[in-house]
Amino acid sequence: MEIINSDEINWTELFLNNEFIVVNYQPSLDCIGCKEINDLFEELSLEKKYSKVKFLWVDSRNNPIAEQFIKKRQTPFIAVFKEGFLVECDNISNETGLREMLERLFAFKFKL
């Protein structure tokens, strides 16, 4: 998993070069409930099934929008994108929830 500061992200380039993106917004790497998701991101990023998925951790303290989500909800806060569009976002704190979210991401079809 790539750990980056949201100030260092070129979001346009990221979305243009990656079909599937999963972002874990959290205030630190050791927040309550975050360690399990961080470890799971690492594991999933190595699985062949998820080889086309870009997994990122973004420090929510440097991202005003993410910070507002987290104030109203809990961490870890996961957002999934397909071809640059937000498909789903929610609090996910276990393997089953994250794998189900990824399956919905893969199955998502744009409506014209």
Locations of regions flagged by a protein language model:
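N-terminal leader/targeting and pre-domain segments
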Residues: 1-21, 97-112
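Short cysteine clusters
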Residues: 31-34
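A short glycine-leucine-enriched loop at secondary-structure breakpoints
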Residues: 68-74
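Non-catalytic, surface beta->alpha helical segment in thiol-disulfide oxidoreductase systems
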Residues: 74-112
